[in-house]
Amino acid sequence: GLGDVYKRQTQDSVNTLLSAAQSGREASEVSPLLWASRRSIRSLERILMPVDNAVRGVRVLSRQALGLTEDRDKVSDAQVELLDELSEIMLAISELYGQGKQHGHDEAIEIPDLVQRLRIVGGRAGLDIIDKDGTLSAYMILGQTRSIVVDMLMVCGLSRESAVAHLVPTSQHPAYPPEVWGRED
């Protein structure tokens, strides 16, 4: 259906960017005329994998949401608010890095704010936002939300370890010391 067409187009676009970045890196290593572009190419390569992961994560989240609604189940209002905030942040990031945009000044101003907003979303994305009668799909959507937060923090320049540390722990033994924002407790 239409969703499959969109999925293929999105994945094709991401794959094209990954391939172009690799070609650009190879060319910049060989050609002295392109040596000055190495830093930009490395930055592009650094963000493309988390972008790819986020796109895939959104597709998985969408399938879970479809299953949830087909079963006539729901997620909590807190989960809806979290997803709404995350989608607004992702839109802002896509507009910031949009095709043909000049980077630099806008990034320096907007990225710190977007990172702070993502940290708050990560800090609120705990098991406690699932309704007491929450379904497996609600938990799966929460898991995907958390994964997308990590991917988007990495797009904004954080390491994976630092990004994961901004998630409210769901384990008694989190792999990375928590640096959680946006929680009252």
Please state what every model-predicted region is.
Residues 2-6:
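Short, small-residue-biased leader/transition segments that mark boundaries at the very start
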Residues 11-12:
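A conserved active-site cap/scaffold subdomain adjacent to cofactor or substrate pockets
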Residues 22-40, 69-72:
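Conserved catalytic-core motifs characterized by acidic clusters
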Residues 43-185:
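Soluble C-terminal extramembrane regulatory/interaction domains of multi-pass membrane proteins
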